[in-house]
Amino acid sequence: MKILHLFSSKVFAGLERHVEELSYEQSKSHQVLVIGPERFKDKFRAEYIAINTNQWRYSPLLWLELRDAMARINPDIVHTHGQKMTSIIKADLHFSTIHGTKKNVAAFKKSQFIFGASKKSLEQIPQQKSMVLENWVDESRFNDFQQKTPEYFLYVGRFEPVKNPQRLIRAWSSDYGKLLMVGSGQLEEDLKKLIAELGLSKTIFIQSETNDVGSLLSKAHALIISSDREGSPKVLYESLYCKVPVLATNCGNISEVLPKTSVAENNDESFKMLIKKWVGKTDKLSSIQQDCFGKVMSKNLLSIQTEKVNIKYQEFLSMASK
């Protein structure tokens, strides 16, 4: 198969890593190309065509560039990620992925088949043209992983309103020990000010984002997710794969992955109580998440999830050839 992935983005986070890993795994047995912004070209292992997909969605230049590129490539399968590219692209065999939860899914409904990060992602999509595709772990990124003596609790993610990192800072206490928050985004300066205002500058530390998630997880007591909205967060699976327990708000598919006792309602008070309950009991937290560790290691691997996507592609190609 000749497969073309398209995305638009200004940061390299969960969606972008999803596209990178999926395209690379597919490239081992198929011809795969990715179209995306120039700034991410060096991060992709599959063949990459740089087009400024971040420009205005109604830009005539963008439409012309995409049309010409698709005509040259002549792909069997076109797979768009996110709402913008999905709304722009027209193709005979058009697959799309909803990576979070969307109020307006009209653009996705126009594609032949839709993958969703969680059941919530697909609530407005007919079942016959969709499937849940949970996120995965690229095992090759963790070949050298070794668990070390825990030093901190860990947040990994964008500093954006939807991730609500302020909720975590407000829930924290100097009695809980070190909290390392790794990421970047529009809220970064606001977070630093909030940390200072709450007198937590010697307890909460902000660090720039890194691709080496394994090194961060190797010294973590637990991963903490404070989001208002999620799809199927990649770092959730990576943490469980590394046998690092997770505390999180109830968003996306998190309640389908973690035990109820590890999940807070999506409000500040419930989240604060969850942190207080478990911060000194991470050994017990690990114990109750043993089944989660095992499930991720047996089912949520890149190779397994990629094969599900490829099989769905083949089904549609077979129908199209009849």
Enumerate the language-model features and the residues they cover:
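Short His-centered aromatic/hydrophobic patch
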Residues: Y58-L62, H79-T86, I98-H99
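Acidic anion/phosphate-binding donor-loop and adjacent secondary structure
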Residues: M131-Y152, S215, S303, A320
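Aromatic "clamp/platform" in nucleotide-sugar-dependent glycosyltransferases that forms part
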Residues: E209, D228
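Conserved acidic donor-binding segment of nucleotide-sugar-dependent glycosyltransferases
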Residues: K260-E269, K276-D283
